[in-house]
Amino acid sequence: MKYAVIGDPVSHSLSPVMHQVNFKSLNMEDTYEALHIPTQDFHDIRHIIEDNHINGFNVTIPHKERIIPYLDEINDQAKAVGAVNTVKIINNKWIGYNTDGIGYVMGLKQVYPDLENAYVLILGAGGASKGIANELSKIVQPKLTIANRTMSRFETWDMDINAISLEQSEQYLDEFDIIINTTSAGLNNNDDIVISLDNLSSSTLVSDIIYIPYKTKFLKEAEFKGNTVYNGLDMFINQGAESFKIWTGKQPNILEMKYAVLNKLKGV
């Protein structure tokens, strides 16, 4: 079987490294590659996938919403989020899934076991935020708080949440047990920081879904203040592991997948 990740750009993706190591550790002859599909060519996606003999694929930026009209079916999680990151192909039928939210929450449970009673603030209101919020809402009892720069973004949300501005979130930081940044601030070593952490409580877990760099400026600042921090590496590994399960019905070797990505990040 042949799998791929599609995006624009996509050459930076660590998904091929992660999945190839997993296939090898399980003695599978399947392959996984990065397939660059420019936005202007996306209308031909069905033919491109068929011509490359792809049996299933992951979808990354900027195609997670764009793929939806080309699918034959979409599962409830992806429908709720309005974005797809995994496509399974059965007898030429394309089925869309979203494993980002569950991937993040699986990892978060390991570092914050009392998730059920946590007061959670999510920064950003894009697809990643919605996926994580949708999954957290199944576990967390207190109402989730989502902060975004523009309030109009919440018009597409169909969830029972507290919607506030980023400025408001800075005032109430000390009320939260977990703060999760889902914005692109800090990506690729830029020095942007989404909010001021001046009012941060020392007991708050501070998280960022970015894993390149391993610690964003946001996490470094929180760590400097003495807080526990948690990046997006587990989310990346777990969403890939969930995709593998969807495609093959088999259990992935998550430890090998994580080592492969860590070694690549370290330049080993």
UniProtKB/Swiss-Prot annotation:
Bilayer-spanning residue ranges: none
CDD domains with a match to the protein in the record: NAD_bind_Shikimate_DH
Biological process terms in GO annotation: amino acid biosynthetic process; aromatic amino acid family biosynthetic process; chorismate biosynthetic process; shikimate metabolic process
Binding positions (shikimate): S13, L14, S15, T60, N85, D100, Y211
Binding annotation for NADP(+): D76, G124, A125, G126, G127, A128, N148, R149, T150, M151, S152, R153, I209, G232
Known catalytic reactions: shikimate + NADP(+) = 3-dehydroshikimate + NADPH + H(+)
InterPro entries, A to Z: Aminoacid_DH-like_N_sf, NAD(P)-bd_dom_sf, SDH_C, Shikimate_DH, Shikimate_DH-bd_N, Shikimate_DH_fam, Shikm_DH/Glu-tRNA_Rdtase
Residue positions of the active site: K64 (proton acceptor)
Subunit structure: Homodimer.
PANTHER family: BIFUNCTIONAL 3-DEHYDROQUINATE DEHYDRATASE_SHIKIMATE DEHYDROGENASE, CHLOROPLASTIC, SHIKIMATE DEHYDROGENASE
Protein name (Swiss-Prot/TrEMBL): Shikimate dehydrogenase (NADP(+))
Organism per entry: Staphylococcus haemolyticus (strain JCSC1435)
Gene: aroE
